[in-house]
Amino acid sequence: TGDKLYFKGELTPASSVGIGTFTLSKKCNAGGNAMSLLFGDNFENQYSLQGKNYAFYALFKGCANLEGVSSDFLPATTLSNYCYCSTFENTSIEIAPVLPAKILATRCYQRMFYRCKSLSYIEAMFTTTPSSTYTSNWVYGVSSSGTFVKHIYADWDVTGVNGVPTNWTLTHDIVNSGYIIGKTGENGHYSD
């Protein structure tokens, strides 16, 4: 209990399989910075996934034992095609990591939180209008109630499986702080 395991590497995403998929046999949380899996020791100040299509495709797909993820786990502000497709599909997370990118790429968030039945909080800063081109079924099967925070300048109004989940409360991030509301710990990051 309380043990930590660290991963880093300089992995190259392969078309349609990304860098691989974790299998978790015990309940756990994911923390740190996912960019360390792509850039090794040079992950700090890396905010672009340009040229890294499928980067984190299905990274935790089907990991029902994944219960939480730190708010700053996915710091990329420049996305690539399919980069987060199915990343958390069928996990048990309650709070999504902050999604700071303002411009979406093709299928970047497709099925990202598909069937995450416990998910009830998403903070997504994109100003691109969500649609099947970018966010196909990204929130299908999430909790029937929750809070969705979007960028103050995001003027889109899309609800349902490709946008803000139906029946969720919608708020705006006035300061674009990247911190989460609810379960917070030191510096506003997720804690349990």
Positions of predicted regions on the chain:
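A structural signal for leucine-rich repeat
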Residues: S136-G141
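Surface-exposed, short loops/turns at beta-strand junctions within beta-sandwich domains
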Residues: T1-G2
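Structural signature of tandem-repeat unit edges
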Residues: L5-F7, S15-N53, K61-S80, E89-T106, ...
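Register-specific detector for alpha-helical tandem repeat solenoids, activating on a conserved position
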Residues: Y57, C85, Q110-R111
